[in-house]
Structures are given as structure tokens and as C-alpha cells.
């Protein structure tokens, strides 16, 4: 049976990437889609692992070819998700996570209506600013811009199926895992897998 496509969104600093990476490590049935981006790699990031890093000309060529399930501009950089790569994983029975913003999520819902979506919130504005500052990667004016972008991103929370608040990492990870586990036990997914057992029980 094909896997389920999940969209996970959050403002920068909410802990989305750490949560998603932890889920992928602990659940073999979950894969993370590797997006294309025009932004430069951050320290420790690897091409093909964290992102496919491409220049703007290559990115626009992929857009023109219709290769992206979704694409968006965030903080002046472009991000996109390969349609064929996602479909290949789903066909293998893997649940696939797209770690994208609300703009990309809206595009994916239109093109793949069966996807499920999760929005992750920080516990407070103060905590979000602390996390962004703690990274040590950005100047104060950049932090201010990211905070403004975060408020804009969070205003779209109601477009999602599930809402989590990342105030305790382990608890939030368990809640995220519970969403995936519960979906796998929906009737329409379990009935084909349990066909023989059901025949035996009801025969």
C-alpha cells in the first residue's frame, strides 16, 4: 500500500527540523523529502542530504520543466520539492515528510489532496526570539525580520490538520509520532493488510 504524504510547517526557530529528523531516525517507515534550494549551505549541511543546493538558473529551469510539486521563495531564497522523488518513496510504502512553509503546503494540498498536514508552534514569542538568538547565526536586524516572518507564518495555522506546541521536545516528538501511528491504523489502511486475518475471524 502506498505511504502517506505529510506536510510539516512551523516558523523558523520552532524546532521543526530537529523534531522531523528525530522522527525519521526512530521510525523506519518515515522518509524526509530532500528539497532543492538556492540558499548557500549552512555549516555542517551536505548537498543531497540536507538539501539539493542549486543556483538560481538551475532552479528556474526545474520550475519551467514542471519538476516541482511545490516551490516558494523564503527569506529571498527559493525552495522546491521534486514531484518524482516524492512519488517514488510513496510507491515504496514510505510515509514522506515535506518540511515546507505555508505557501508550499497550500500548493501541495491542491495537487495531492490526500496529504496530511502538521503545524508546530513555539510556546511563546519570547521563547522563539531566544531560540533564534541562541543560534548565533544572524544579526539583530535579521532576528527582527525572522520574528516578523514567524508571525506571518503562524497566522496560517488553521489551514493544517494537526497543531502541536513544542514546549517539551520529547513530548512533542511523541505527539508527532502518534499522528503517524494513528493514521496507519485507519480502517482503509488496515483492512487490506488484515484481509486474511479478517477472513479467518469472520469466516
From Swiss-Prot:
<dbReference type="InterPro" id="IPR008145">
    <property type="entry name" value="GK/Ca_channel_bsu"/>
</dbReference>
<feature type="domain" description="Guanylate kinase-like">
    <location>
        <begin position="3"/>
        <end position="181"/>
    </location>
</feature>
<dbReference type="InterPro" id="IPR017665">
    <property type="entry name" value="Guanylate_kinase"/>
</dbReference>
<comment type="similarity">
    <text>Belongs to the guanylate kinase family.</text>
</comment>
<keyword id="KW-0808">Transferase</keyword>
<dbReference type="GO" id="GO:0005524">
    <property type="term" value="F:ATP binding"/>
</dbReference>
<dbReference type="Pfam" id="PF00625">
    <property type="entry name" value="Guanylate_kin"/>
</dbReference>
<dbReference type="GO" id="GO:0004385">
    <property type="term" value="F:guanylate kinase activity"/>
</dbReference>
<dbReference type="InterPro" id="IPR027417">
    <property type="entry name" value="P-loop_NTPase"/>
</dbReference>
<dbReference type="InterPro" id="IPR008144">
    <property type="entry name" value="Guanylate_kin-like_dom"/>
</dbReference>
<keyword id="KW-0963">Cytoplasm</keyword>
<keyword id="KW-0547">Nucleotide-binding</keyword>
<dbReference type="GO" id="GO:0005829">
    <property type="term" value="C:cytosol"/>
</dbReference>
<keyword id="KW-0067">ATP-binding</keyword>
<feature type="binding site">
    <location>
        <begin position="10"/>
        <end position="17"/>
    </location>
    <ligand>
        <name>ATP</name>
    </ligand>
</feature>
<protein>
    <recommendedName>
        <fullName>Guanylate kinase</fullName>
        <ecNumber>2.7.4.8</ecNumber>
    </recommendedName>
</protein>
<dbReference type="InterPro" id="IPR020590">
    <property type="entry name" value="Guanylate_kinase_CS"/>
</dbReference>
<comment type="function">
    <text>Essential for recycling GMP and indirectly, cGMP.</text>
</comment>
<keyword id="KW-0418">Kinase</keyword>
Amino acid at each position: 500500500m502506498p505511504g502517506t504524504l505529510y506536510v510539516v510547517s512551523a516558523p523558523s526557530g520552532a524546532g521543526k527540523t530537529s523534531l522531523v529528523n528525530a522522527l525519521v531516525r526512530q521510525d523506519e517507515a518515515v522518509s524526509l523529502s530532500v528539497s532543492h534550494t538556492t540558499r548557500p549551505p549552512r555549516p555542517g549541511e551536505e548537498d543531497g542530504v540536507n538539501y539539493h543546493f542549486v543556483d538560481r538558473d538551475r532552479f528556474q529551469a526545474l520550475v519551467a520543466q514542471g519538476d516541482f510539486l511545490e516551490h516558494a521563495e523564503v527569506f529571498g531564497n527559493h525552495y522546491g520539492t521534486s514531484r518524482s522523488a516524492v512519488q517514488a518513496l510513496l510507491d515504496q510504502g514510505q510515509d514522506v515528510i515535506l518540511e515546507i512553509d505555508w505557501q508550499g503546503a497550500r500548493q501541495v494540498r491542491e495537487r495531492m489532496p490526500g496529504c496530511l498536514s502538521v503545524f508546530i508552534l513555539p510556546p511563546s514569542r519570547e521563547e522563539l526570539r531566544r531560540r533564534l538568538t541562541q543560534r548565533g547565526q544572524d544579526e539583530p536586524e535579521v532576528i527582527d525580520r525572522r520574528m516578523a516572518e514567524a508571525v506571518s507564518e503562524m497566522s496560517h495555522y488553521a489551514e493544517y490538520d494537526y497543531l502541536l506546541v513544542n514546549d517539551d521536545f520529547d513530548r512533542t516528538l511523541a505527539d508527532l509520532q502518534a499522528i503517524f501511528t494513528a493514521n496507519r491504523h485507519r480502517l482503509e489502511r488496515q483492512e487490506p493488510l488484515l484481509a486474511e486475518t479478517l477472513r479467518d475471524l469472520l469466516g
